[in-house]
Structure formats: structure tokens, C-alpha cells
Amino acid sequence: TIDNNQEVTNAFTNNGTITNLNNNNGGTLNDVTNSSTGTITTLTNRGTLNGTLTNENGGTIQTIENHDNIQRIDNQQGGTIDTLNNEVNGSITTFDNSGSVTNDFTNKGDITTLHNHNTGTMNNLTNATNATITTLTNDGQLTGGITNETNAQIDDIINTATLGTITNNGTITNNISNRTNATITTIANAQGATIGGVINETNATITTFDNSGLVQNNFTNQGIITTLNNNETGRLENLTNASNATITTLTNKGTLTGGITNQVNGNINTIDNQANLAKIDNSGTIGSLDNKNNAKIDRIDNQAGAEITDVSNEAGAEITTFENSGSVTNNFTNNGEIGSLTNFAQGTLNNLTNSGTGHIGTLTNEGQLNGGITNEAQTQGSPDGGKIDKIINKNTLSKIDNSGTITEIDNETNASITDLTNQSEGVIDNLKNQTDGTIDSISNQGHIKDGTNDGHIKGFVNAKPNAQ
């Protein structure tokens, strides 16, 4: 046992074995080296350790307990520290690990810079309640991951290699940055916890991001995220999936204030919205977009050149505005509420169905609407069937098949409708065919209450000539 209560002025080097090295209150050590042949069972610091505590290649320190101030710890490649604890009121300015920290590392004090270098191996790193780490960088293997406890603070986490799980119950002030080609298995942001921002760089991977807390600033994915969950208590501000980035499944059950932006060549396989979502601005590819019961999306913009495979707005769900200048490849099914749906000149829709529970305020077609519009008959709980307040056609429309209620159909100048069928349950309040508008065929088995024709109607079959 070595007890130091004063100052050791020069450097201290251990080439042998020390069972207990105690730097006590009032003690000062300057540059301590545990050499390649050295072993220290327990090093306890309650004083000041200036310079660097170096554990060289082949050296072993079984336990480091710090209660006061260590300027720098350098665990070199091939060096082993079994257990490292920075206790309450303990301060480590810099910890550089290029070797192995075998057991869990717990920080209960303050660490300014913690750097796990490319040859470094760490298991579980815990930043305990009321503890602080300014910058945490992992270039090696941090297999068990990082836990930031309640009221604990980490300013920045930077990962360039392999990191297991980041569990945040406290505050990560600035960013979690997952750098190019790096991997994080899971990020879990708990209820009441805060992360400033998240950056997943090109070719970087986050397998699961699970948010029940707050991400204050931008969340930018430039790489790959397999599963992204914004849970009931979760709040995200702006979520951007950048060019050539991929999100496999994105589920929103919480608050996504700034909405989702999917940039050119970005890919989101599935968006499952179960809560309030400000917007979806798509310039890339979205596979399935599903707005669930009682959920609301304020605005969806599918830009020119962008693609959405399937859109489903479920019963009880609401989309305030949907504007399409790109392509919706397969079915577009509305079982809920859509305030305004516009298919612009560059846009393509295929098979637009407003079901028996659906309501669309204004539906405007200026582009291609292949497969036409189907407004379905009543279903249980929907005595009037599907309802569309107004259809405005400014281009070519293959069909309108109505078994519900349409307040007005306006086929504008130079526009055309191939087949308009009003089924036995169908009600059309007003049909307008403007100058040089063309309707090839009208088949009415229901009720068309009023209409004006200033264009061309080539065929009209009225199965209910006395319908009111």
C-alpha cells in the first residue's frame, strides 16, 4: 500500500505490483505511469492527479476510484482497466481509451472529454444522476452502450464505429451524431428526457430509434434507420430523410410538429400515422402511407417526380390537404375525411376510392387519374354513403362511379370524362359540363337532381326518368 498525503513532485512509474495506491486528501501526484509490466490492484484518488495517468500496453489496473481531480487518463492500446468509477464530486478532464475497460464504467461526477479510440473496447457506460459529460466520442467498440440517467447531462455524443444502446433518461444537450459507416443498435429517449438533435450520416445505421421524450431540434437521417417510433408521449420537431437515405418503418403516435420531409431519392418504406402530424413533404419514394383512426395529417405534398405506392386514410382519420404532382402508383383509399385533394398537371393517381365512410371536400383533377373515381355506397354507421362535396375535372378522367352522394361535378372547358355512372343508391345534386367539355357516356340509375350542359354529351341513359 502507498498512501500519499503530500506532493510527489516528479513522475511516478510502476513497473511491478502495487496492491493499493491511495492519493489522499491534500495529496498531489504528477504523471503516474503503470508500465507494460505493471499491475495496480486499486488506485484511489481523493486529491489531485496532474498530468496523465497512463496505463501502457500490457499494463493492468484492476480498479480506479476517483473522488477528486484527475487531469487525464490514458489507457493505451493493450492496456486493461477492469473497473473505472468517477464518483460524486470527482472530475476527469480527459479520458482516452485505446485499450480495454472490462467492466461497467460509471460516472457520478464530471468528465469534460471521454474518447474511446478505434482500438478501444468498453462495455456499459453510465452517466449517473446529476453527472455531466461534455463530449463523448466512440471510435471503437462500446458494446453495451450508454445510459444517461435522470437529471444527468451529456452535451454531445459522437459515434464513428459500433455502439450498442443509447438510453436517455436525462438531457443530451446538443446532438447524437452517428457518423458515416457507423452503427448504433438502439436509441431510446424516455418520457421526460430531452435530446437536442439527431444526425445519422451517410451509410450510417440506426437499427431502432424509440422516442417517448423530446427531440428539440432537427432529426436528420442521411443513412439507414430500420425502425423509428415516436410514441404517445414523444415529440419530434422536424424529421428529414435526406437524399439516398432509407427509413424502413416510421410510426408516429405522438407529436411531430414540423412534420416529415423525404428528399429526392430518399426512401421511406412505411409511414404509419396514429396521431397529429403537421405535414408530409415527399420528393422521394414512400411505399405505404397509412393515416389511422382518429389521426390527423394537416398537409401532404407529393412533389413532381416523387412516388407513393399506396395511400390509406382510415375511418375517423383526417387529411386536411393532399396535393399531388408526382405519382400514387396503386390504390388511394379514403375511409375518413379529406378537406382538399388536388391532382396537379404533372400528377398521376390510380384508382381513387372514397368509401362508404369517406368524405372529400373538394377533389380537383388537372393531371392523370387512371382508373377514375369510385364513390362507394353506404356502410354501417354511414347512412348517406361516401360523400364528395365537389369534383372539378380539368383534364381527362376515365370514370366516375357513384353509389354515394356527390354535391357537384364540374367538367371544365376542354376536359373529358369517359364514363359517368350514377348507381341506384347514388345521388348527384348538380352536374355541370362546361363549354367544350366532353362526357362520352352518362348512365343514371339513381338521382341526378340538376345539371347544365354547354359542351358535348355523347350518350345518356337514364334508368329513372322520373327521379327527383
Segments predicted by a language model, with ranges:
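Extracellular beta-strand-rich, repetitive "passenger/adhesive" scaffolds
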Residues: 1-468
